[in-house]
C-alpha cells in the first residue's frame, strides 16, 4: 500500500479506490476473525506469562542473549496474533500503516518493555476476564448477605464450627482469614472491585473508543464485485442511489454519497453510550472511594433543650478526612415532637434545630424529620431515631421533678420507656413508688405501689390523677432526638456518576430501540452495526450490506427498504446516467 | 367499607378472568384453529388490566399513598406490570411469544397475592416515617417494573434454552446416524450463527428452519424486554440510593435487599456483555438470564422472607414474634 500510494495520487477517485479498499477489507477481516482471535488471545497470555517466568528464572547475565532471542520470538508471535484488535485502531487512520512496520522489525528488549503495558491492557480488557470479575463480585456480595456481618469472632466459632464444616470445607477459619465477617470492606472484595475498575478502564481505552472511531470512518466500495461479495446483496434495475440514500436516511442510517457510490451505516449512538456507561461506573467507583476515605460520621442522642458541638460527634473514617470550619458549629435542639396517625401510631418525628457559630450567632434554623435532613457547610444532619429522656412530674403541687426515663426491653420493634417515682422513705431498702410507662410522647400509663393499673394521662393535659391520696400531674414528656451526622465529599461525585449512568443507560436503550424497530442492533460495546454500500451502475443500483447481528432481520429490513426505492421511468434515465458519470 | 367491597370484587373479577385466559391459551396451544379464541383471550387480558388498575386506584384513594408499600400491594403491582407488558405488543399489532409468558406470570403473581400466605396483609397499613417521601413512588415503581420486565425476559431465555437443548440433542443424534461424527454443542451453535439462514445448507428441513426462527425470535424478544427491565432496574437502584442518602444517612448501606438488587444488576450486566461477545452469545447469555430469574426471586422475596435489614417493611416473616 505504501508503495502504491505515491504512484496514484493523480485523480482523487482513483486514489480513493486504492486507498480506501484495503482498509475496508481489513475491517471486515477483523470482524470475521473475531471468534478466532479469542483463542489466540488466551494463547498469548500463556505465552507472555511463560516468557516472564523465563526472565525471572534466568537472572544470570550470561543468558542474556538467549533471553533476548526468547523475547524476540515471543514478541513476534504476540504481535502478529494480538494485533487485530489494536490494529483496527491504527490501520484505517491513514498514517497508521507506516508506524506498524518499524514496530515489527524493532523487537528488542526495549520494544518488549514498550509493548508490555499494551499487553497488560489487552489482558485486562479481555471480556471473559471482566465477566469473571463481575461474577465473583456478585458471589462475594451474596456471601456477604448470607454470613452475618460484623459479629464477634466467638459468633463465627459457633456458627461455622471446625467439627462440622459447611459443604465439607467452610469453617470459621475461612471466614476470619478472608475477612468475610466484614465482607464489604474486606481486601478480597475491595481488590476485586478495583480489578473490575481497572478492567473497565482498559476496555474503554482499548476496545470501545477505537471501535467508535472505526464506526465514524467512511469507506466507500467502488467496485460492483466488492459489493456483491457482501453478506447481503441485491441488484435494483432502473433505480438511483440518491433515492436509496433518502430512504436509508429515513430509516435512521447515516448516509454518505460520493459520485455513484453510497455508504450508509447505523449504530453509532449505540457505540458511544456504552463508553458513557463505563465512564459513569468509574465515576461512581471513584466517588465511593472518596466517600470511604474522606468522610466523617457520628450519631448522637440529644434531649430537647440541650446543645452539642458538631466536631465532638463526628469521627473520621479514612486518611483523607479533614475537619472544616463548620465543625465548630454548636447545635441546639429547640424542640423535639412527633406526629401521630388517628389510630395512635407514630407518623413522623421532627426536631427543631438551631445552629450557632463560634461567636454565638445563629447561622441557621430548621426543623428536620426523617427524609428531610439539614445541610450546613458540608455537614448533613439526619433525623434517625428518638427516645424519651424524662418526665416532668408534679406531686401534690411540689416540683416539678424531672424523672429520667429508661428504655425497657420488650420483644418486637416497639419501644417502651419507664420511670419510677418513689414514695415514702427513699433510703429504705425496698422502696415503693409509682411506675410510669410510655410508648411514645402521647400518653403515659401509671401504676400504683402495688403495681396495679391506675390510669392513662396525656402530658400537657394538666389533669391530675389520684394515686393513694397523692395528686400526680404529668406536666411534660421530654423526648430526645436521635441524630446522625456526616460529611461526605464523595456524594457530588457519586451523584454525577448516577446522573451520567442513568442518562447513558437511557441513551443506549433508546438508541438501540429506535434501531430495533428496524434492525436488532445491540446494546453494549462493539455490537450492533450495520453497513450498506451501493453503487450506481448505469441505470441499475447494486446494493450490498452487512451487519454483525440479527442477520435475518437485517435482510428483512433491507428488502422492505429496497421495495420502497422508486423505479425510474425512461424519461429520467438520461439524467441518471449523467449523475453516474459525474 | 365501599372501598373494601369494591376492592374485593375487582380482585375476584381479575383473577377469574386471568384464569380463563390461561385456559384459552392452553387450548390455542393444543388446537391452532381457534383464532377467535385468541382474540377473546386478548380481550380478557385487557379486562384484567382494567380491573387491576381499578384495584390499585381504589387502594390508593382509601389508603392515601401509592399502593406499593407492602408485599401484597407490590405483588398486585407486579401483576399489573405484567399485564401492561402483555398489552403493549397487542396494541402494536405484533403477535409474539411474550404473551405466553406474561399471561401465566400475571396469573401466578395474582394467585399468590390473593390466595397465598398473605391473607392477613390485605388491609392497607400506615406508612412508617422512613417511607414518607416522594421517592417512594419513583423507587418502588421502577424496581417492581424492572423485576417484572426482567422476569419476563429471563423466562423467555429459559424457554430458549429448553428449545435449543431439545434441538441440539436431536441434531447430535442425527449426526451420529448420518455422519458418524458428533459435534460439540457450541460448535453447532456457532455454525448456526455463522451461516446465513437463506443459504443454510446444514439444516435443510423446513422444520429446523422454523425452529431456528423461533429461537431467533425468543432471543430477540428476550433481549428487548431484558434491556428495558435493566433500564428500569438501574433507575430504581439509583433513585433508591439517592433516597437512602436523604433518609438513612448514606447512599449505600450494604443492606441485604440493596446488595441483592446490585447482584441482580450485575448478573444482567453479565448477560448484556455475554451477548456482545460472539463466542459466548446465544446459549450462554440465555443461561445467564435464567440464573437471573432465580436471583430476582431471591432479591424480591427471599430477602424479605428472612426479615433482615432496613428494607423489611410490610413483609411477613417466617419466624413469628
Curated annotation (Swiss-Prot), chain B:
It is a multi-pass membrane protein. Keywords: Chloroplast, Cytochrome c-type biogenesis, Membrane, Plastid, Thylakoid, Transmembrane, Transmembrane helix. It comes from the Eukaryota. One of its GO terms (biological process) is cytochrome complex assembly. It holds the Pfam family Cytochrom_C_asm. Signal peptide: none annotated. One of its GO terms (cellular component) is chloroplast thylakoid membrane. The keyword Isomerase does not apply. Disulfide bonds: none annotated. The chain crosses the membrane at residues 17-37, 48-68, 71-91, 98-118, 143-163, 225-245, 259-273, 286-306. GO terms for molecular function: heme binding. It is found in: Plastid, Chloroplast thylakoid membrane. Required during biogenesis of c-type cytochromes (cytochrome c6 and cytochrome f) at the step of heme attachment. This is Cytochrome c biogenesis protein CcsA. It comes from Populus alba (White poplar). The gene is ccsA.
Amino acid at each position: 500500500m505504501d508503495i502504491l500510494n505515491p504512484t496514484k495520487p493523480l485523480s482523487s477517485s482513483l486514489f480513493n479506490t486504492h486507498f480506501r479498499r484495503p482498509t475496508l477489507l481489513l475491517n471486515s477481516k477483523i470482524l470475521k476473525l473475531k471468534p478466532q482471535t479469542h483463542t489466540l488471545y488466551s494463547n498469548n497470555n500463556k505465552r507472555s506469562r511463560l516468557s516472564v517466568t523465563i526472565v525471572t528464572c534466568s537472572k544470570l547475565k550470561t543468558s542474556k542473549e538467549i533471553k533476548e532471542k526468547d523475547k524476540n520470538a515471543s514478541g513476534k508471535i504476540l504481535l502478529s496474533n494480538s494485533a487485530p484488535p489494536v490494529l483496527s485502531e491504527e490501520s484505517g487512520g491513514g498514517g497508521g500503516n507506516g508506524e506498524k512496520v518499524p514496530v515489527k522489525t524493532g523487537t528488542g528488549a526495549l520494544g518488549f518493555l514498550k509493548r508490555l503495558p499494551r499487553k497488560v491492557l489487552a489482558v485486562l480488557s479481555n471480556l471473559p476476564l471482566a465477566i469473571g470479575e463481575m461474577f465473583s463480585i456478585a458471589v462475594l456480595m451474596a456471601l456477604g448477605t448470607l454470613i452475618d456481618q460484623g459479629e464477634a469472632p466467638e459468633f463465627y466459632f459457633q456458627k461455622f464450627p471446625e467439627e462440622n464444616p459447611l459443604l465439607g470445607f467452610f469453617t470459621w477459619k475461612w471466614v476470619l482469614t478472608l475477612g468475610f465477617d466484614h465482607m464489604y470492606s474486606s481486601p478480597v472484595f475491595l481488590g476485586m472491585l478495583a480489578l473490575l475498575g481497572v478492567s473497565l478502564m482498559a476496555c474503554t481505552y482499548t476496545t470501545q473508543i477505537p471501535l467508535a472511531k472505526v464506526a465514524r470512518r467512511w469507506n466507500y466500495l467502488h467496485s460492483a464485485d466488492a459489493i456483491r461479495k457482501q453478506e447481503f446483496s441485491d441488484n435494483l434495475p432502473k433505480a438511483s442511489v440518491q433515492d436509496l440514500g433518502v430512504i436509508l436516511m429515513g430509516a435512521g442510517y447515516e448516509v454518505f454519497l460520493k459520485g455513484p457510490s453510497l455508504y450508509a451505516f447505523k449504530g453509532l449512538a449505540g457505540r458511544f453510550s456504552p463508553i458513557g456507561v463505563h465512564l459513569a461506573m468509574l465515576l461512581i467507583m471513584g466517588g465511593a472511594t472518596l466517600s470511604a476515605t474522606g468522610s466523617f460520621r457520628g450519631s448522637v442522642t440529644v434531649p430537647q433543650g440541650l446543645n452539642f458541638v458538631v466536631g465532638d460527634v463526628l469521627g473520621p473514617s479514612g486518611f483523607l478526612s479533614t475537619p472544616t470550619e463548620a465543625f465548630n458549629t454548636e447545635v441546639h435542639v429547640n424542640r423535639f415532637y412527633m406526629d401521630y396517625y388517628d389510630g395512635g401510631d407514630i407518623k413522623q418525628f421532627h426536631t427543631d434545630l438551631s445552629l450557632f457559630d463560634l461567636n454565638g450567632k445563629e447561622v441557621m434554623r430548621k426543623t428536620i424529620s426523617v427524609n428531610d435532613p439539614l445541610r450546613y457547610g458540608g455537614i448533613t444532619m439526619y433525623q434517625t431515631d428518638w427516645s424519651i429522656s424524662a418526665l416532668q412530674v408534679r406531686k401534690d403541687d411540689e416540683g416539678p421533678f424531672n424523672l429520667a426515663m429508661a428504655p425497657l426491653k420488650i420483644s418486637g420493634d416497639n419501644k417502651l420507656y419507664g420511670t419510677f417515682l418513689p414514695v415514702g422513705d427513699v433510703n429504705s431498702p425496698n422502696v415503693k413508688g409509682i411506675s410510669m410507662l410510655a410508648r411514645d410522647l402521647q400518653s403515659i400509663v401509671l401504676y400504683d405501689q402495688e403495681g396495679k393499673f391506675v390510669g392513662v394521662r396525656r402530658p400537657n393535659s394538666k389533669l391530675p390523677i389520684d394515686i393513694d391520696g397523692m395528686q400526680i400531674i404529668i406536666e411534660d414528656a421530654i423526648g430526645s432526638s436521635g441524630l446522625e451526622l456526616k460529611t461526605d465529599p464523595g456524594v457530588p461525585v457519586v451523584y454525577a456518576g448516577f446522573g451520567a449512568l442513568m442518562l447513558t443507560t437511557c441513551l443506549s436503550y433508546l438508541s438501540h430501540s429506535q434501531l430495533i424497530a428496524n434492525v436488532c442492533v445491540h446494546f453494549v460495546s462493539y455490537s450492533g452495526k450495520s453497513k450498506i454500500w451501493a453503487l450506481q451502475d448505469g441505470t441499475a443500483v447494486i446494493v450490498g450490506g452487512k451487519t454483525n447481528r440479527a442477520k435475518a432481520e437485517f435482510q428483512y429490513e433491507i428488502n422492505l427498504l429496497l421495495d420502497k426505492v422508486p423505479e425510474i421511468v425512461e424519461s429520467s434515465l438520461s439524467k441518471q446516467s449523467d449523475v453516474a458519470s459525474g | 367499607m365501599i372501598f373494601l367491597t369494591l376492592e374485593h370484587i375487582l380482585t375476584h373479577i381479575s383473577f377469574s378472568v386471568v384464569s380463563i385466559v390461561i385456559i384459552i391459551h392452553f387450548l390455542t396451544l393444543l388446537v391452532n384453529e381457534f383464532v377467535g379464541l385468541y382474540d377473546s383471550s386478548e380481550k380478557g387480558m385487557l379486562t384484567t388490566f382494567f380491573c387491576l388498575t381499578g384495584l390499585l386506584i381504589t387502594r390508593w384513594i382509601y389508603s392515601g399513598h401509592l399502593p406499593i408499600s407492602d408485599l401484597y400491594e407490590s405483588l398486585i403491582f407486579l401483576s399489573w406490570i405484567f399485564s401492561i407488558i402483555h398489552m403493549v405488543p397487542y396494541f402494536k399489532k405484533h403477535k409474539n411469544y411474550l404473551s405466553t409468558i406474561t399471561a401465566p406470570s400475571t396469573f401466578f403473581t395474582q394467585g399468590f397475592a390473593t390466595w397465598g400466605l398473605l391473607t392477613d396483609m390485605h388491609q392497607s397499613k400506615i406508612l412508617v416515617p422512613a417511607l414518607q417521601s416522594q421517592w417512594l413512588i419513583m423507587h418502588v415503581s421502577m424496581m417492581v417494573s424492572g423485576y417484572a420486565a426482567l422476569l419476563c425476559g429471563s423466562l423467555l431465555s429459559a424457554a430458549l434454552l429448553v428449545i435449543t437443548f431439545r434441538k441440539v440433542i436431536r441434531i447430535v443424534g442425527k449426526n451420529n446416524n448420518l455422519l458418524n461424527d458428533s459435534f460439540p454443542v457450541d460448535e453447532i451453535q456457532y455454525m448456526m450463527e455463522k451461516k446465513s439462514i437463506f443459504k443454510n445448507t446444514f439444516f435443510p428441513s423446513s422444520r429446523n428452519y422454523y425452529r431456528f426462527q423461533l429461537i431467533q425470535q425468543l432471543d430477540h424478544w428476550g433481549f428487548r424486554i431484558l434491556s428495558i427491565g435493566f433500564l428500569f432496574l438501574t433507575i430504581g437502584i439509583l433513585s433508591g440510593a439517592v433516597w437512602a442518602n436523604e433518609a438513612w444517612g448514606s447512599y449505600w448501606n450494604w443492606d441485604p435487599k440493596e446488595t441483592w438488587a446490585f447482584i441482580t444488576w450485575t448478573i444482567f450486566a453479565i448477560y448484556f456483555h455475554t451477548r456482545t461477545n460472539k463466542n459466548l452469545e446465544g446459549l450462554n447469555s440465555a443461561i445467564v438470564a435464567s440464573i437471573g430469574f432465580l436471583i430476582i426471586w431471591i432479591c424480591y422475596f427471599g430477602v424479605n422472607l428472612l426479615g433482615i435489614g432496613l428494607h423489611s417493611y410490610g413483609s411477613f416473616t417466617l419466624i413469628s414474634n
